[in-house]
Structures are given as structure tokens and as C-alpha cells.
From Swiss-Prot:
<comment type="similarity">
    <text>Belongs to the bacterial ribosomal protein bL36 family.</text>
</comment>
<dbReference type="Pfam" id="PF00444">
    <property type="entry name" value="Ribosomal_L36"/>
</dbReference>
<dbReference type="InterPro" id="IPR035977">
    <property type="entry name" value="Ribosomal_bL36_sp"/>
</dbReference>
<dbReference type="GO" id="GO:0006412">
    <property type="term" value="P:translation"/>
</dbReference>
<dbReference type="GO" id="GO:0005840">
    <property type="term" value="C:ribosome"/>
</dbReference>
<dbReference type="GO" id="GO:0003735">
    <property type="term" value="F:structural constituent of ribosome"/>
</dbReference>
<dbReference type="GO" id="GO:1990904">
    <property type="term" value="C:ribonucleoprotein complex"/>
</dbReference>
<protein>
    <recommendedName>
        <fullName>Large ribosomal subunit protein bL36</fullName>
    </recommendedName>
</protein>
<keyword id="KW-0689">Ribosomal protein</keyword>
<keyword id="KW-0687">Ribonucleoprotein</keyword>
<dbReference type="GO" id="GO:0005737">
    <property type="term" value="C:cytoplasm"/>
</dbReference>
<dbReference type="InterPro" id="IPR000473">
    <property type="entry name" value="Ribosomal_bL36"/>
</dbReference>
Length: 37
């Protein structure tokens, strides 16, 4: 899980999800998991 000021999808399988006002990216590749800090 990477915490970054700006999150962007890295590949086609990355999905952008809003949870409790935070933007997250989930993907099949665990390295692509991100969350906005």
C-alpha cells in the first residue's frame, strides 16, 4: 500500500474507489495498491 498525495491508475486493471472520502486504487497487482494521504 502506497500513500501518496496524488493517486493515479498504473495499469488497465487498477480501479479507483472512494471510501469514506478517501480515494483508493485497488488492483490485481499488490504493488499497485494506493491510497490518498
Amino acid at each position: 500500500m502506497k500513500v501518496r498525495p496524488s493517486v493515479k491508475p498504473i495499469c488497465e486493471k487498477c480501479k479507483v474507489i472512494r471510501r469514506k472520502g478517501k480515494i483508493r486504487i485497488i488492483c490485481e497487482n499488490p504493488k499497485h495498491k494506493q491510497r490518498q494521504g
